[in-house]
Amino acid sequence: MPHFIVECSDNIREEADLPGLFAKVNPTLAATGIFPLAGIRSRVHWVDTWQMADGQHDYASVHMTLKIGAGRSLESRQQAGEMLFELIKTHFAALMESRLLALSFEIEELHPTLNFKQNNVHALFK
C-alpha cells in the first residue's frame, strides 16, 4: 500500500499523460515517509462509456482514489492528500484550461483486519 487508482474518461487518453503523473505520484508518496516505496502502485482504468452532466458537451473526468492501510493519523493523511491533490491539479492545469474537465480525489483507508496482502518487492528496498 498505497494504491493510487485513476478512473479516466477515454476522451483524454492522449492528453492526460498518466505515465507522467504516476512518475510524479510515486516518489511524492514515498517522500512523505509514511508509505513504503515498494508498496506504492499506480494504475489507470480507462472508462469508454460515461455521461457527465447533461451530456451535451465533450466533458472529461478523472477520479482518483488513494487506497491506504489503516493506522496513519488524520493529520498525516490530510497532509499527504493535500500535497497529492496539488500535484494532480498542477499536472492537469493545461488540460483544465483547454476543455471541460472534472477532477476528483479521495483517500480510502482500508479496514485493518479485512485487508490481506503479500509482497516480496519490499525486500528489494531494505
UniProtKB/Swiss-Prot annotation:
Pfam families the record matches: CHMI
Gene3D superfamilies: Macrophage Migration Inhibitory Factor
Enzyme class: isomerase
GO biological process: catabolic process
EC number: 5.3.3.10
One term of GO molecular function: 5-carboxymethyl-2-hydroxymuconate delta-isomerase activity
Catalytic activity of the protein: (2E,4Z)-5-hydroxypenta-2,4-diene-1,2,5-tricarboxylate = (3E,5R)-5-carboxy-2-oxohept-3-enedioate
Pathway: Aromatic compound metabolism; 4-hydroxyphenylacetate degradation; pyruvate and succinate semialdehyde from 4-hydroxyphenylacetate: step 4/7
InterPro entries assigned to the protein according to its UniProt record, in alphabetical order: 5-COMe_2-OHmuconate_Isoase, Tautomerase/MIF_sf
Record's function text: Transforms 5-carboxymethyl-2-hydroxy-muconic acid (CHM) into 5-oxo-pent-3-ene-1,2,5-tricarboxylic acid (OPET).
Record note on pH: Optimum pH is 7.6.
Keyword vocabulary terms for this entry: Aromatic hydrocarbons catabolism, Isomerase
Catalytic site positions: 2 (proton acceptor)
The name this protein goes by in its record: 5-carboxymethyl-2-hydroxymuconate Delta-isomerase
Domain of life: Bacteria
Quaternary context: Homotrimer.
UniProt entry tagged with the keyword Isomerase: yes
